[in-house]
Amino acid sequence: MSSSVAVLWVATSSLNPDPMNNCGLVRVLESSRLFSPCQNQRLNKGKKKQIPTWSSSFVRNRSRRIGVVSSSLVASPSGEIALSSEEKVYNVVLKQAALVNKQLRSSSYDLDVKKPQDVVLPGSLSLLGEAYDRCGEVCAEYAKTFYLGTLLMTPERRKAIWAIYVWCRRTDELVDGPNASHITPMALDRWEARLEDLFRGRPFDMLDAALADTVARYPVDIQPFRDMIEGMRMDLKKSRYQNFDDLYLYCYYVAGTVGLMSVPVMGIDPKSKATTESVYNAALALGIANQLTNILRDVGEDARRGRVYLPQDELAQAGLSDEDIFAGKVTDKWRNFMKMQLKRARMFFDEAEKGVTELSAASRWPVWASLLLYRRILDEIEANDYNNFTKRAYVGKVKKIAALPLAYAKSVLKTSSSRLSI
């Protein structure tokens, strides 16, 4: 269930993955060859730490709002204090926020006019425009709603978001695509090495070239990209999560990372009085909310794959087990359990809304639209009487269309759902 894209924050709703491509990339990752025989072919159609000092009040407040089951600080068997998943993730947030603040202090920094660093591209640099165009085609083909939202952005931001989307999609395809059975940890190691080269301005193919150009233009940190790959490693070896702390880390890896990747491109409103750190916290919260929504929507589908993406300790507290999920029967125990899970996801959406209002004007509308639509999936789960075993909750076309003017109003008025609602 490694849904990796949430319109950037949010394109998780649009993933319909295909392998990163069917032109030999898996073979290249498994071998020592430098180039795939058809590295620049079009994607085929198919399926879907520098440690800062911690604020104890921040840990306490987030734990209370989000309902984290475990304590913030945990003693290891050796007596050392281990960081909770939220703390580990927050360290990445601080690092990215510091990078953006450093760029903003530079008088030469302008998101839409800054010239990129030179990117070493196999062949002619004139292919860079074609690379971005291809990324746009992939978005249009597999994430139609998200793609339309990107058209509201400035041309430079739009292209950069396309490039990030495509990289996330290709990464997700490693473990969720048709070739997933051939992927090994070594293949992911090679994919990460390729990422490192990309950030050094040495892309492997034309789609990598678009992202290499993007990270040269914008203050995007490499750590969220590494962390997404770590999420793919987790999916290869893990199908159960003992508590919400474990699940939170997984959700960050496969979806929260996308928010950290994309906010430097989307930009923060110059008039915003919010701290950069708080905006990134909200972006992270939206990624977590989207992934939790995916998990709650796809319980039955995941169970048929032998996977349970629900906290084992909370299932036990509700008098439930994996066997109940595999049986697929909606009982009062299941309804009560689901009510608590939906409540938690909505709390993350609430936290995310605080940051959407602080984004640049050109980015707010598409993010609001995606947030509102994804949040409605939780309502549909309730409407299905919590039957997420045999029914897949989705938002119909009429409701999608109805959400657009509301999202626009929110983006203009810079308000949250507490003042406007569907």
UniProtKB/Swiss-Prot annotation:
SUPFAM superfamilies: Terpenoid synthases. The keyword Cell membrane does not apply. Pfam families: SQS_PSY. Belongs to the phytoene/squalene synthase family. Keywords: Carotenoid biosynthesis, Chloroplast, Isoprene biosynthesis, Membrane, Plastid, Transferase, Transit peptide. Catalyzes the reaction from prephytoene diphosphate to phytoene. This is Phytoene synthase 1, chloroplastic. Residues 1-70 form a transit peptide. Its EC number is 2.5.1.32. GO terms for molecular function: 15-cis-phytoene synthase activity; geranylgeranyl diphosphate synthase activity; squalene synthase [NAD(P)H] activity. It is an enzyme of class 2 (transferase). InterPro entries: Isoprenoid_synthase_dom_sf, Squ/phyt_synthse, Squalene/phytoene_synthase_CS, Trans_IPPS_bact-type, Trans_IPPS_HH. Monomer. Interacts with OR. Interacts with ORLIKE. It catalyses: 2 (2E,6E,10E)-geranylgeranyl diphosphate = 15-cis-phytoene + 2 diphosphate. It is a peripheral membrane protein. It is found in: Plastid, Chloroplast membrane. It comes from Arabidopsis thaliana. One of its GO terms (cellular component) is chloroplast. One of its GO terms (biological process) is carotenoid biosynthetic process. Pathway: Carotenoid biosynthesis; phytoene biosynthesis; all-trans-phytoene from geranylgeranyl diphosphate: step 1/1. Its main location: plastid. It comes from the Eukaryota.
